[in-house]
Structure formats: structure tokens, C-alpha cells
């Protein structure tokens, strides 16, 4: 069912495609010439972007990007586009995008004011909240509850940035940065740390994949709002317009609901659609994330 806001977003995305400056169409021209697109994907950002047991890159974000590829095919009037997948980590995703190694980043990347200086973002496709994963015997209801705890951080993430800013002020804790979410989660499970702050959806995905939901707590305390979006190169207006159009179409038609249920309502994991996520479908937007309790952007 088409909402008024989704209809307007779709019309805007359609209009953007026909008002593009020539210099902004480089990636679309490359795709037309090579008939290939490279998607930047994650190894273990379940359920958004991960490698399954069959060694395939799958997930909610991956499906959204594949939907965008179909839209690109229609725009370029191509019968087929070869899709290549390239694994990226948190610290690598922006450098690899800017270097041209990937064309779209299809993971769990938060749209932030700082990142907007380097890249462009699509419409929001999910809104997470930063929370804290702990063993069952640790309860986190305020930042002060983290004082004195050894804490794991994942490199190149908004949680690393936020907790680094908090350290030495409101937060007095031992921070250890790990290469990725999987390593930080492993440190928690092995007892090397007692807390792991990260987006709640990713924490639940890690715990569900490990069949450890009953042994862990995800804090009621939410430290930030984390709107996820597809990343493209800064100024790549032609490609961004088509990605936005593909998202606006499935939001307006309601197809997004079935896609959401496919990845967030499974035997292993159930994540109810939050109000902010639903609002992003009915009122497509590109609002940046914010550390809501601390009063600054992330």
C-alpha cells in the first residue's frame, strides 16, 4: 500500500535520475560497460549481511542491494548484471568504497554526520539502538553501571567512537578494541571482558548464531539511535538515485514487510519491527544517528 510519504520519496527518486550532472554517473557508466557490480558485504553481521553455511553472502541488507541491482538493470536497460561480493570489515568499508573496490556497501553501517563528510547514504532501511551485551549476572541500566568493567569494542564502529569519547569522563573502565564484532563477542563469551556495547540487532544476531541468548543480557539502556543505510561514493548521484528509488518502491508497495519477516522472524531470532524502523518505511528519510543520552552526533 502506497503511503503519501513513500509516494513522494519514490517521485523524488525518479526525478533525481533524470536531473543528474554528467560527472556524477561514473559508477553507472562503469556498470553499463562491464555489466558487473561489486557489493561490499560482511562476514558475520547477522541478519543483515553474513556468510551462510553454504559460503554464500546473504542477509537483509544483501537482499536490499540485490533489489537495487534489479533497479539498475531496468535503468540501464540491461538483461543481466553480474554481481560480485567482496568481504569488508568495519575499518575497511569506507576506504574500499572510496578506492573503487566496491560499488555499494551492503552491511550494517550507521548513517552518521562524520561519515557523511566522506560518503553518501541511501534512505534508512533499519534503525537500531546501541545497547550493551553482558553475561546474565551483569545488569546495565545506566552508564555508571559500566564503571570498573573490562569492555570490548569493535574497531571502526560507532560504539568504539562513543565509548572512546566517554572514557575518562563519565565512564571509568578498561576498554579493549578488537578487530571485529566476532572477536569482541568471543572475548565476552570467554570471560576476557564483561561488557560489549554494539547495536542491539547485531548483538542479538551474534548471540542467536551462537545459541547463547539464554546466557546473556542485552541492556535496557540505549545509548544511541543507529539508522542503517546503503553507502555509495560521495557525489555518486546517479547510483544513489537508483538505490533510493529501489528502496522507495518496496517501501511504498509494502514488499518490505515480507523481506523484514524473512530475516527478523526466524526460529533462531525474532526482532520486532521498531517504531523508528517502521517510520523509515512510511516516511523515507536520511536522518543521521545520534547519541541521544549524551547530546551529540556520532
Q: Which residues does each predicted region cover?
A:
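Extended ligand-binding regions for polar small-molecule ligands
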Residues: 63-71, 144, 149-150, 155-157, ...
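Bilobed "Venus flytrap"/periplasmic-binding protein-like clamshell domains
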Residues: 44-47, 57-74, 110, 128-181, ...
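Acidic, polar ligand-binding/catalytic clefts
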Residues: 66, 78-145, 281-296
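N-terminal signal peptide c-region/cleavage motif recognized by signal peptidases
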Residues: 19-21
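Periplasmic-binding protein-like
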Residues: 43, 126-134, 200, 208-247, ...
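A ligand-binding cleft/hinge motif common to bilobed small-molecule-binding domains
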Residues: 92, 106-117, 162-167, 187-190, ...
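Extracytoplasmic small-molecule ligand-binding "clamshell" domains
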Residues: 29-105
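Immediate post-signal peptide segment of exported/extracytoplasmic ligand-binding proteins
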Residues: 24-54, 139-140, 144-149, 282-298
Amino acid at each position: 500500500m502506497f503511503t503519501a510519504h513513500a509516494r513522494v520519496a519514490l517521485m523524488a527518486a525518479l526525478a533525481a535520475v533524470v536531473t543528474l550532472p554528467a560527472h556524477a554517473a561514473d559508477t553507472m557508466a562503469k556498470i553499463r560497460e562491464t555489466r558487473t557490480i561489486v557489493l561490499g558485504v560482511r562476514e558475520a553481521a547477522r541478519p543483515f549481511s553474513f556468510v551462510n553455511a553454504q559460503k554464500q553472502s546473504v542477509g537483509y541488507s544483501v537482499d536490499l542491494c540485490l533489489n537495487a541491482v534489479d533497479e539498475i538493470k531496468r535503468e540501464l536497460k540491461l538483461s543481466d548484471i553480474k554481481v560480485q561480493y567482496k568481504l569488508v570489515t568495519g575499518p575497511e568499508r569506507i576506504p574500499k568504497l572510496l578506492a573503487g573496490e566496491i560499488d555499494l556497501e551492503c552491511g550494517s553501517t550507521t548513517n552518521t554526520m562524520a561519515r557523511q563528510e566522506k560518503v553518501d547514504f541511501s534512505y534508512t532501511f533499519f534503525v537500531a539502538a546501541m545497547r550493551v551485551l553482558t553475561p546474565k549476572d551483569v545488569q546495565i541500566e545506566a552508564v555508571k553501571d559500566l564503571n570498573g568493567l573490562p569492555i570490548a569494542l569493535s574497531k571502526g564502529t560507532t560504539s568504539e567512537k562513543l565509548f572512546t569519547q566517554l572514557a575518562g569522563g563519565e565512564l571509568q573502565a578498561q576498554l579493549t578494541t578488537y578487530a571485529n564484532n566476532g572477536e569482541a563477542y568471543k572475548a565476552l563469551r570467554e570471560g576476557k571482558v564483561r561488557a560489549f556495547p554494539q547495536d542491539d540487532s547485531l548483538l542479538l544476531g551474534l548471540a542467536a548464531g551462537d545459541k547463547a541468548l539464554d546466557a546473556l543480557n542485552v541492556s535496557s539502556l540505549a545509548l544511541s539511535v543507529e539508522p542503517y543505510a546503503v553507502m555509495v561514493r560521495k557525489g555518486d548521484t546517479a547510483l544513489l538515485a537508483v538505490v533510493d528509488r529501489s528502496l522507495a518502491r518496496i517501501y511504498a508497495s509494502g514488499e518490505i514487510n515480507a523481506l523484514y519477516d524473512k530475516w527478523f522472524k526466524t526460529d533462531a531470532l525474532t526482532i520486532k519491527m521498531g517504531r523508528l524502523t517502521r517510520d523509515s518505511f512510511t516516511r523515507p528519510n536520511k536522518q543521521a544517528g545520534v547519541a541521544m543520552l549524551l547530546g551529540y552526533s556520532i
